[in-house]
Amino acid sequence: MDSSKPMFLDIETNGLDPDTIWVAVTMQDGVVQEHYTPESLTQALAGKFKVVGHNLIGFDMPVLWKLWNIHVDKSRIEDTLVMSRLSNPSREGGHRLSNWGEILNFPKGDYNDWSCLTPEMVKYCIQDVKVTAKAYDKLKLELRKFSKESIDLEHDVQHIIQKQTKNGWLLDLRHSMDLLADLKETKMKLEWAVHQNFKPKWVDVKEVTPKLKKDGSLSKVGLTDDEFTKVIESGCMEPFMRRVLKPFNLGSRKQIGEYLQDFGWKPEKFTPTDQPIVDESILFAVKDIPEAQLIAKYLMLQKRVAQVQSWVEAANDDTDRIHGYVNTLGAVTNRMTHSKPNLAQVPASYSPYGKQCRQCFIARDGYKLVGFDASGLELRMLAHYMNDQEYTNEILNGDIHTANQGLAGLESRDQAKTFIYALLYGAGDSKLGSVAGGGAKLGGQLKQRFMSNLPAFANLKDSIAREAASGVIKGLDGRVLHIRSEHSALNTLLQSAGAIVMKKALQLLEEYGRLHSLDYYFVGNIHDEVQAEVRAGQEDSYGRLAVSCLEAAGSFYSLNCPLTGEYKVGESWADTH
């Protein structure tokens, strides 16, 4: 057996939150070993070779540390789940080991009884290890065009986020329950107000033709009691339309759209089935129809109730902490995604009930919440790739949105702010034109004027479009990014670059935070912000270090536009972002 080759590892336990490890299986250079004691596995893992497993960072290693006191240095760990997500975040069938078995035509098999150790369980574990080894070989080929830096960074970030998930984020349960009660009461009152304005309607059901019996009298077949009586009283045997009084259903977006059109609403966005799109963001913009505002407020409250309810339900019964799931490579741009619950969707403080929602998330006793975020991240990434000194200077020393206003010929700074992000997100001419109150023609003119006045942008856009024709482009740190469409290529590049520098800053902060003996726990990593619990008295030391790590991340990648950010200290998330 060649002890320099990677060792593949898998364990079987008595559940996802286990207190027993039944068996650990290792395979190195084709030699399979079963381990039933910590001593046996510890001996097998001794050395400098790589240790490879599927979700090794997220499950196996934390369990081995907790139950068998076994630790493997992170520099030795390679996780095929991380590798699979990095290679192709949108892999058909997903990233589970079972899907890899299908991809490789080497099924991992099925087993579901984790209550006791059985020969079948051991056989299942051995097969998992063999599938992992084959997946690893395939992934090494897939990742051959990725830089080592990008692969190492994503493994480090997975380690950090695993600790964040384990730590969780403390929920102020009393405040959350009070907020939930308030939201439900307000929603109930609004429901009453809605039904005062949205009255039941008579709707046609079907045409009914009265029939006669053989003796010439009216038959009751096919008629309701009321219809039978009316036909008898009127003596009219002509077909008639059956109608019913249909109450307004607040749960039906289709009905909401129909009623609002009766009130004078002219929808502009439609579903593929030609139904008007109804959501609170669209309806809040309909200022001249009170009924639209009423529905918008209701839909907003409905969403807030569901959100706060999901946080309360997710909080651990013993600790009140939320251990949300984070996929560190969930988006095609390699941004993190969040679920169970989705804390990336917690409303901003300026949104309706946003401040109260963010006040739900706090720090433990003796700690403060410290949040830091990057300043103008996507525009700084744009400036890096354009490498236009004048534009970069506007970001660093001027007002970039006023500059963009002039470049596009827009009437206001607010329009310019909306315009530039719409442009970067690949918006079409109609969307761009709507920013200034026009249509596709105006949008095309604005875009053309902007690109004519900023040739570096036009050149970058053309260059990325040519590269994206192959279906992939190179990311900031040498990773490969999959492109879904040409119009999304630039946005994918910029968002990915932003995600990469934030991950690098996180990696540096974890390294230097420990070196400086700071006492902190990450609780949230959401796009361009990082939230942490920091021991009281160390807040400013941590905050200054966090911002310096962000700046260092920009220097590490030799960005043409320097990065910076700011940090805030408070009792809750409402204070820190």
Question: Language-model segments: what does each one mean?
Answer:
Residues 1-12, 17, 23, 111, ...:
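Conserved "right-hand" nucleotidyltransferase catalytic core of DNA-directed polymerases
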Residues 1-5, 43-45, 353-368, 511-516:
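A short acidic-Thr-Gly-centered motif at the start of a beta-strand
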Residues 2-8, 15-142, 376:
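Conserved DEDDh/DEDDy metal-dependent 3′-5′ exonuclease domain
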Residues 19-23, 371, 378-408:
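Metal-dependent catalytic core segments for phosphate chemistry
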Residues 77-81, 361-377, 423-426, 432-438:
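Conserved catalytic palm subdomain of right-hand nucleotidyl-transferase polymerases, strongest
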Residues 336-365, 377-396, 547:
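Extended active-site and interfacial segments that coordinate phosphate-rich ligands
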